[in-house]
Amino acid sequence: MLVPRVWSSVRLGLSRVLSRTLRGWPSGEGRGMDLSGIYPPVTTPFTATAEVDYGKLEENLHKLGTLPFRGFVVQGSNGEFPFLTSSERLEVVSRARQALPKDKLLLAGSGCESTQATVEMTVSMAQVGADAAMVVTPCYYRGRMSSAALIHHYTKVADLSPVPVVLYSVPANTGLDLPVDAVVTLSQHPNIVGIKDSGGDVTRIGLIVHKTRSQDFQVLAGSAGFLLASYAIGAVGGVCALANVLGSQVCQLERLCLTGQWEDAQKLQHRLIEPNTAVTRRFGIPGLKKTMDWFGYYGGPCRSPLQELSPAQEEALRLDFASNGWL
């Protein structure tokens, strides 16, 4: 967390851009941002001694930047953000912005457990180059995270954020699904532009699309495993871990959906399901980083307590890709 003195100066610096009314941002402040497209949630590379390897981060981004992504997510779940210090998180955002073409959106994961810490991190990430803040649900006290509590939290963050805010619901990690009623209420905030929903419940995604249809609110699928279904129900894009290694294929699936080539899209989606599951639910970030090594990127180790795969797990991971024609 930033020290109080720094936080005070940050608040002072925002006085030129933030509305000081009780309602926060004036209507329409964040609504011009078009999130449509595919975003890889990039990993944070580490050295053998568990230091952040910013050089490898830049190398990966230079390679990924040649693909037709709408943008990139840094410091999301795949970025191991809970294991990084505040200064490391900010440096990752800064280095990413410098490494990426200016036409690529940079979404930065700024979520923290307290509202104040989240505001501080959001403001700081905006100052070092984030185009939007992706804010995960606070979850340590999940039993008290009612719709009212979450609405208050996100409203405060959006009121004080100098960049648009994207809600982030990832129940597999947090044990907390951002309630639909809270999403609908928050969709009315002029500086909240969308949600990344990683829960995999397509019915829920469709309901959010339906209930926010009167707002300029955008839904991003949180996985390549249900990307086709999400497009069919009204999502505008996806934040897909698999795009770190099969980026061209995930972007191809997007194109097939957008052009109505549903039979070809279905065939491709089927071939992406097992690899996607392998680098998410089954083997997680260690699995994703291992496949990055195979596909010409730098994966490397994770930070402890995440452990590398066993030989048997690595073989199972390879089979999930090879059996679908990717290796």
Swiss-Prot record:
Activity regulation info: Inhibited by divalent cations.
Summary of the function given for this chain in its UniProt record: Catalyzes the final step in the metabolic pathway of hydroxyproline.
pH-dependence annotation: Optimum pH is 8.8.
Reactions catalysed, as given in the entry: (4S)-4-hydroxy-2-oxoglutarate = glyoxylate + pyruvate; (4R)-4-hydroxy-2-oxoglutarate = glyoxylate + pyruvate
Stated name of the protein: 4-hydroxy-2-oxoglutarate aldolase, mitochondrial
Binding site for substrate: 77-78, 198, 222
Active site residues of this protein: 196
UniProt key word Lyase: yes
InterPro entries to which the protein is assigned, alphabetical: Aldolase_TIM, DapA-like, Schiff_base-form_aldolases_AS
Keywords of this entry: Lyase, Mitochondrion, Schiff base, Transit peptide
EC number, as in UniProt: 4.1.3.16
Any GO CC annotation of this UniProt entry: mitochondrion
Annotated positions for site Involved in proton transfer during cleavage: 168
Main location: mitochondrion
Top EC class for this record: lyase
Subunit record text: Homotetramer.
Entry's localization field: Mitochondrion
The organelle targeting sequence, given as a residue range: 1-25
Domain of life: Eukaryota
Family: Belongs to the DapA family.
One function term, GO molecular function aspect: (4S)-4-hydroxy-2-oxoglutarate aldolase activity
Cited Gene3D superfamilies: Aldolase class I
GO annotation (BP), single: glyoxylate catabolic process
